[in-house]
Amino acid sequence: MQVLPPSSTGGPSRLFIMRPVATTLLMVAILLAGIIGYRALPVSALPEVDYPTIQVVTLYPGASPDVMTSAVTAPLERQFGQMSGLKQMSSQSSGGASVITLQFQLTLPLDVAEQEVQAAINAATNLLPSDLPNPPVYSKVNPADPPIMTLAVTSIAMPMTQVEDMVETRVAQKISQISGVGLVTLSGGQRPAVRVKLNAQAIAALGLTSETVRTAITGANVNSAKGSLDGPSRAVTLSANDQMQSAEEYRQLIIAYQNGAPIRLGDVATVEQGAENSWLGAWANKEQAIVMNVQRQPGANIISTADSIRQMLPQLTESLPKSVKVTVLSDRTTNIRASVDDTQFELMMAIALVVMIIYLFLRNIPATIIPGVAVPLSLIGTFAVMVFLDFSINNLTLMALTIATGFVVDDAIVVIENISRYIEKGEKPLAAALKGAGEIGFTIISLTFSLIAVLIPLLFMGDIVGRLFREFAITLAVAILISAVVSLTLTPMMCARMLSQESLRKQNRFSRASEKMFDRIIAAYGRGLAKVLNHPWLTLSVALSTLLLSVLLWVFIPKGFFPVQDNGIIQGTLQAPQSSSFANMAQRQRQVADVILQDPAVQSLTSFVGVDGTNPSLNSARLQINLKPLDERDDRVQKVIARLQTAVDKVPGVDLFLQPTQDLTIDTQVSRTQYQFTLQATSLDALSTWVPQLMEKLQQLPQLSDVSSDWQDKGLVAYVNVDRDSASRLGISMADVDNALYNAFGQRLISTIYTQANQYRVVLEHNTENTPGLAALDTIRLTSSDGGVVPLSSIAKIEQRFAPLSINHLDQFPVTTISFNVPDNYSLGDAVQAIMDTEKTLNLPVDITTQFQGSTLAFQSALGSTVWLIVAAVVAMYIVLGILYESFIHPITILSTLPTAGVGALLALLIAGSELDVIAIIGIILLIGIVKKNAIMMIDFALAAEREQGMSPREAIYQACLLRFRPILMTTLAALLGALPLMLSTGVGAELRRPLGIGMVGGLIVSQVLTLFTTPVIYLLFDRLALWTKSRFARHEEEA
């Protein structure tokens, strides 16, 4: 097949070579636009790829998990299940709290999802309990996303109730108003309230019941409209002393009369200022505190949000008393900034290394300056396009630019080398620039579009992984396009003005020595190539062996999803026996905190005990361990986690589960460990049968560690078995029984105190200090139909049973989540396969379904599409090359280089002990685009030699290989050195960048060595095949 002859008049570069001023000003414009774009771009850890997620929390103090599920969660789930665009709905119903997490499709705007959620809540309102203290509250936040900032508020002079009141009113509300903030939570449970603790014996002796007291309190404290008077000349608003504001006022409240004497609330109860929920507590290090966690909205920029908070914080803290101390314990943006700074440093290092290699090859300062200008100009110009595409400066886009350093210099090198060759032959610089640029223009276009073709499949990757790498692929493609433009405009213009025979011939001792070295290398390569061309079948067997080895390595290499990052923050879950009380759990938490804070890598610790929207049961505690900066500690986060777990194992009666926080959050639940696997059934009974069996087998697998389940069905329950006949005969209804129990043991919110700034609750309960445990039930009294007082024990028996501490649903069906980590000597792929094999051995019934969740599910999806992604990249490149060369054969020759890149990348990953994760796969796809450049440069010149000089195919490819050896070696080394800083990365976020560098460096080294010999052999093989095919067709035509 024929290709278009290269122009000797400069081609598309002619206009720019002949008009240097216009070309210079055009490049200055690109430079200024890029600088302005860089300053305007936001900074983040990763591209914003969050699923639209909304959390709905409903609190119903005193309700059991079963009541929460049936009375609150189920009605809401039925309404939410009808929403369009809903991807997944999970819920957790625990004692007094229902948390529903709604994850929507990526294409659905968060504001639209918010409107649908509000409409669903409104539709479910009439189905919820009438005495629900507050309606369901939704937040635009992913509960599994770690807080962007954690603050601890402490005071040595003020009670925690006053501290929380001030913080909630003066600080939390203001922070909630900041753009990008999704939720501000105050952990510690010290919200002010008036607590009424009834003396059961006292009210029994007076013939009263708790319901009598509750009715008296609710009737005595009201805040409703009273109207106004409108006279002939004046209007008067009516008001009254219907509100009671303090504990003293409640203490004086008359609740009944006996023999004409008043019975005041203080006579039968202890009334005091206290906390609304006494079973909640938070600590910062070892000090009781109010812990403020700030979470961002899905899609919000974490850096700008945190900057806004820090800017406002001094003003907010000034409004607090001096005895109140606000401490920032963690700020995720600190590590994000450090990671981005390290990546920017590696980008600058890559540019410096690339320029150094250029000088090593060209041995000429003017010739080195030209690509030294082209490289930063191409990269800086990319920022201008990124602004228009709403991208950000993040680890992936900076990685793309770092890799692009090796790409964009290739075009400039090829142009300079070709123009320099003509100048050295005696051509005038201007004529050489026109001739050299015209000759190489088609090659530049081929290189550019075939490389961009490799990136096209990345743009069509589905789900969150596709969104994640879209910015990477487009940023890299834009840099390559700008590089091609610069190489066809600025580079030849500068060559025509800066290069000359004198400058190129001017040599020093270094240049003469390096010239001799390169001449010897080229001569040695020529001798080796001649031998290889004489033994083509041996070379072909090597090429086929690399293809087979690539397949074998692909099958056996450990596979992962996303590198585990060291962001300096560890999330933890502390688990105690299921019957543990709040006091018992708080004591255990303090023991564990003492152990953790002794570790030299730990900077601070926050912990929380109690049941709320984030913690499902009293026997668990949430921990956040903040590590010292990476340069102030000796070990990475995984070693710190292992050390902490070993230390905490010595604390009796608790299990500690730890996992490092990650920039990429795909999960919607706060789990104990990194990976999740769910078991779903149509009933809780089915789960209770199969969960223990599966857990027993999974805990024996060496591929898994820290295996745990959120299935807790051994919570103690005091079951009140009422004799309904006896109760009915006395005129006592089940509602009366429930009310009596709720009044006594539910921390019941019975009334509201309204102030100008806030609202506070009146909490009713029995004082159980003298009657702990089940004995407190003997003090319950009910009112019969004739007004008499009836002990609960006369109509009911108390049975001790077991029940789940929380009930979880996934898409409205009961589910349990099994969490696990992966040991160091295994990969996530090994763990997933082991779980699937174990599941098959159990023969689960058809009503039991299993599914991986979060990052494990994303891993399966990414792994399934990886092969097709690579195939798509190869096909896309074949189509582009076929169109450019007008040939079916030459693209195959070019693509024959790919297995060598795969072998090199996979071997490098194995040697380095890295998994084949999505970052490494991106590196392999980029290698597909890089290594074919060698073949393109060889084939272009071989075809031109055959066409213009009448050489035989063997002579043409031999001369092309020797002629293009130096630029091939130079461009490969430039790409290799561009990836080298990533491979050697050790700073913050290095775990994310290193697999890309390792794969690319390994692939480039192996492919460079092999393709210099295999490509010419395959070129000649296909040439002979084409001639044989033509002769066969010609013979058939003659016979016909």
From Swiss-Prot:
Keywords, comma-separated and alphabetical: Cell inner membrane, Cell membrane, Membrane, Transmembrane, Transmembrane helix, Transport
Segments crossing the lipid bilayer: 16-36, 347-367, 369-389, 396-416, 440-460, 472-492, 537-557, 863-883, 888-908, 911-931, 968-988, 998-1018
Gene Ontology MF terms in the entry: xenobiotic transmembrane transporter activity
Bilayer topology term: Multi-pass membrane protein
Gene3D superfamilies tied to this protein: Multidrug efflux transporter AcrB pore domain, Multidrug efflux transporter AcrB pore domain like, Multidrug efflux transporter AcrB TolC docking domain, DN and DC subdomains, Multidrug efflux transporter AcrB transmembrane domain
Predominant location category: membrane
Signal peptide: none
GO cellular component term of the entry, any: plasma membrane
Subcellular location: Cell inner membrane
Reported induction: The mdtABC operon is transcriptionally activated by BaeR.
InterPro entries: AcrB_DN_DC_subdom, Acrflvin-R, Multidrug-R_MdtB
Domain of life: Bacteria
Family membership: Belongs to the resistance-nodulation-cell division (RND) (TC 2.A.6) family. MdtB subfamily.
Self-association and partners: Part of a tripartite efflux system composed of MdtA, MdtB and MdtC. MdtB forms a heteromultimer with MdtC.
HAMAP family per the UniProt record, alphabetical: MdtB
Function statement: The MdtABC tripartite complex confers resistance against novobiocin and deoxycholate.
Alphabetized PANTHER family for the sequence: MULTIDRUG RESISTANCE PROTEIN MDTB, PTHR32063
Protein name as it appears in the record: Multidrug resistance protein MdtB
Native organism taxonomy: Bacteria, Pseudomonadati, Pseudomonadota, Gammaproteobacteria, Enterobacterales
